[in-house]
A protein has these predicted regions:
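Short aromatic-cysteine micro-motif
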Residues: 2-160
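Short beta->alpha transition motifs characteristic of CBS
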Residues: 149, 167-170
Length: 170
């Protein structure tokens, strides 16, 4: 849901620009209080009851809309542990945290520029060698289960390349 959307044009029930800003403010407060944030180790998947999860060897969530992913991620919130789609600024921080991993990026003064994220798990048009038993044929393509592509794991986080084009809150 873009931040600049008119309150009357929102597709998520009860969504307003104010609620969007409040979510971001709450994130900033949590990061300050906790000294950081966590990111799920495995891609978002759903169990047999269609409940969202982040577990290895599961059917990953694909071909979904921003709105569905937003709602799905929220469903993982339990107690004081919150779950939400990652914000762009969090994505950027993950990439910076991984900057020393197989990179060819640029540092200018105190600024850091990611000029090629393929070394950080972003693999457009990349061939990944994997055995037949690790996949399920889906038409003319193969569907990987969560955590299957070990070569796409960096700092123990699997496949930042994306199954939902890495939707972010923005």
């Amino acid at each position: 849901e873009p931040a600049n959307i008119d309150d009357n044009g929102a597709s998520v029930a009860g969504w307003t620009q104010t609620s969007y800003q409040e979510e971001f403010n709450a994130l900033v407060k949590r990061v300050k209080n906790d000294g950081g944030f966590w990111v799920a180790r495995f891609e978002t998947s759903v169990d047999s009851n269609n409940v969202a999860q982040s577990k290895q060897n599961q059917k990953v969530l694909t071909n979904t809309s921003w709105y569905n992913l937003y709602t799905t991620q929220k469903s993982l919130t339990k107690g004081t542990t919150t779950s939400h789609m990652i914000w762009g600024c969090q994505w950027d921080q993950i990439m910076i945290w991984m900057k020393d991993i197989r990179n060819n990026n640029v540092v200018q003064g105190s600024r850091y520029f990611i000029i090629n994220s393929s070394n950080m798990g972003n693999y457009l048009n990349t061939e990944i060698k994997i055995s037949e038993d690790q996949t399920k044929r889906a038409g003319e393509a193969f569907r990987f289960k969560s955590g299957e592509v070990g070569g796409a794991m960096i700092k123990n986080i699997y496949d930042l390349a994306g199954n939902v084009w890495e939707w972010t809150m923005e």
